[in-house]
Amino acid sequence: MFDIIKAVIIGIVEGLTEFLPISSTGHIDLVNHVIKLSQSQDFINMFEYVIQFGAILAVILLYFNKLNPFSKPTAKARNATWQLWAKVIIAVLPSVVVGLPLNNWMDEHLHTPLVVATTLIIYGVLFIILENYLKNKNAHITTLADITYQTALLIGLFQVLSIVPGTSRSGATILGALLIGTSRYVATEFSFFLAIPTMVGVSILKIGKYLWQGNGFSGEQWAVLMTGSIVSFLVAIVAIKWLLKFVQTHDFKPFGWYRIALGAIVLLVMFI
């Protein structure tokens, strides 16, 4: 019963932070240091990533018509949707090439409060610096159609940075997109779309690794996994709608300051 309650809390954290540029994995790592599940470490490692699938389902639900080429009434519209998917796949490729070989090493060595706190602060500072730089500049990529295949690849290269815990997948992609001239709204939406193949792939990889190690799922573990995923799905719907509305009238500096403050608090707790 206590693990179900913990799964609800972790699911809320995941749903709130997956698409905000503040690192969902970093937040979950920190939460797990306070209310760690009473399960094996193998299950916990898998759980942290697989509940992200619930958040991804929120994107699929909210953008189903926009991302479904078969729902388009004209050949031109269908072709535009297929092109968008092609750009998403191109953007994901760098993470596949770099992330897969380093996955196990990252899990074993970098999931620590010190690493999370450090990356929270570094990218918080970068967001503030970048937003100050962009203050009087106009974006030249203002629609998803404006994103070229080359631009998609560049954004995908930035996503590779998120393999370090605390960086934030959405944060890295949004930061990169802003840097190359994408509007905040389009950068945010494209980051959502990149999450679909990226996190579905990671979830499958983590489940496969968990089973390959000879583990199975008890009834309680299934309940914990489903609870966390469902809660993250529901909360992510709210978070996505809120973020899209927020970026239409605000920049990302508040997230930068939040990252710096949280990172500093973690460091203080560690060393005091």
Swiss-Prot record:
It comes from the Bacteria. It is found in: Cell membrane. GO terms for biological process: cell wall organization; peptidoglycan biosynthetic process; regulation of cell shape; response to antibiotic. Its main location: membrane. Keywords: Antibiotic resistance, Cell membrane, Cell shape, Cell wall biogenesis/degradation, Hydrolase, Membrane, Peptidoglycan synthesis, Transmembrane, Transmembrane helix. Its EC number is 3.6.1.27. It is an enzyme of class 3 (hydrolase). GO terms for molecular function: undecaprenyl-diphosphatase activity. The keyword Metal-binding does not apply. It is a multi-pass membrane protein. Bacitracin is thought to be involved in the inhibition of peptidoglycan synthesis by sequestering undecaprenyl diphosphate, thereby reducing the pool of lipid carrier available. Belongs to the UppP family. This is Undecaprenyl-diphosphatase. It comes from Lacticaseibacillus paracasei (strain ATCC 334 / BCRC 17002 / CCUG 31169 / CIP 107868 / KCTC 3260 / NRRL B-441).
